[in-house]
């Protein structure tokens, strides 16, 4: 059943995406889009998966989202990946989330398509994460 669902999704999703793209008014594209990456735990719970799986699934969608923004000429995208409230979560949930963020940002820098900036209260983050984020920013292209 999962294979059938995956196959249908791989066929139908590109058709759906193309239909949406045709309906967009590209003359009204915003210069800057901000997105709060939220709902991954709820998605995981609804799909009987772990929070870590939900956060990983959300992170995998970032590339798709940024690609859509490129296709529609959005110049600046702000992704709110972590709130200070998230930092008060239990370590068993927080640590995997921080690792997923580090991997996601590192992965974005490897594409070489986007200039990365890290904003926010980075002094509240663990040193290892701040280091990884700064390394990713340094590897991203200058634009």
Predicted regions span which residues?
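Flexible, compositionally biased loop and terminal segments
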Residues: 1-143
């Amino acid at each position: 059943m999962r294979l059938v669902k995956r196959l249908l999704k791989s066929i139908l999703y590109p058709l759906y995406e193309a239909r949406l793209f045709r309906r967009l008014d590209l003359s009204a594209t915003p210069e800057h889009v901000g997105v709060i990456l939220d709902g991954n735990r709820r998605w995981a719970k609804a799909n009987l998966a772990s929070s870590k799986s939900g956060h990983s699934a959300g992170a995998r969608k970032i590339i798709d989202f940024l690609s859509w923004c490129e296709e529609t000429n959005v110049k600046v995208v702000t992704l709110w990946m972590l709130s200070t409230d998230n930092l008060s979560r239990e370590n068993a949930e927080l640590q995997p989330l921080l690792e997923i963020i580090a991997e996601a940002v590192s992965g974005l820098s490897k594409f070489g398509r986007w200039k990365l900036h890290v904003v926010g209260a980075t002094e509240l983050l663990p040193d290892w994460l701040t280091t990884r984020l700064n390394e990713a920013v340094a590897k991203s292209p200058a634009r």
